[in-house]
C-alpha cells in the first residue's frame, strides 16, 4: 500500500483485520481523555506499534528520514489504517 506524505510516496504493508482492531483499541486508549490530554509517551508508543505493522524493519526503513518526518509518516500511516485519512474517506465515499 502507498501513502503520500508531503509529496513523497511511502510504501507500507497492508494491515490485517486483527491488527486494525488492536490499533483501534490502542488509539481509543491514547485519546480516551480527549486530544488535549494525550501523553507524548503514549502517542509515541502508538506510532511505534504502527511502525511495526507498516514496515518489516522500521529502524532501517525510516532511518533516512529526519525524526519529525518519521512522525509524519507514521501518523499518516496510522490514520490511513484506521480509515481516518482524507484518502480513505474519499475511497469510502465519505
Regions found by a protein language model. Name each.
Residues 11-94:
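Short, surface-exposed, charged amphipathic helix/loop patches that serve as local interaction elements
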